Amino acid sequence: MDALFMPQFHPARDIHDVYFVKEPTHARSIAEPYLTRVVQAHEKGTGAGSTGWGYQFDVERAKRLVLRSQGTAVSARALAGGASVPGKYFSIARCFRYDQVDATHATDFFQVEGIVLGADINFRTLLGLLNLFAREVAQAKEVKFLPAYFPFTEPSVEMHVRHPKLGWMELGGAGLFRPEVTTPLGVSVPVIAWGLGLDRMAMVALGIHDIRDLFSADLDFVRTMRGNF
């Protein structure tokens, strides 16, 4: 989350800094020059009007090993690895959060993560791709977008689709990476990013009313699932 320009003591990190690895507890090192650049972004900003968060970055805290809480961490690693421009990168990431288990939430789930970068990329490009995912993958009939806030994107948006029984349901969040994210990773062109709940997309596509049923051991139930996903 440090590479995503989320302050180390920000309340938004409460759902991310939860599942800590017991052994080893810390990474041996963090690759340079990315560590120095990320520290600079947090403490003083990246220039061009960016002032950072104005606190002293704790490198030892950054080395703590935690289970991934969202797939955007994979996107940051892809950018740091020397992403091509223009380029498109996608992944399916298993994530872990301390959520109250109910019909639409689980403590571990899968996210479809994507980034697209290029000189001509903009917010309209992002909305078009999100709409395509919702209609072609989740097979949603109704889609809507709502303004959102994430520390690492600006502007940001949430995508919701209508489930036949549960009503409007959030599929995930998206936005344009802030310069404080892309500059330390060596990227100078716009980058759009999104993380969508694959399990929830399957719920809509398969007509399932409870996310726990996706992992049911009831073979009769599995055989009666409609369609393919």
What are these regions (language model features)?
Residues 1-229:
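TRNA-recognition modules of translation machinery and tRNA-sensing kinases, especially anticodon-binding
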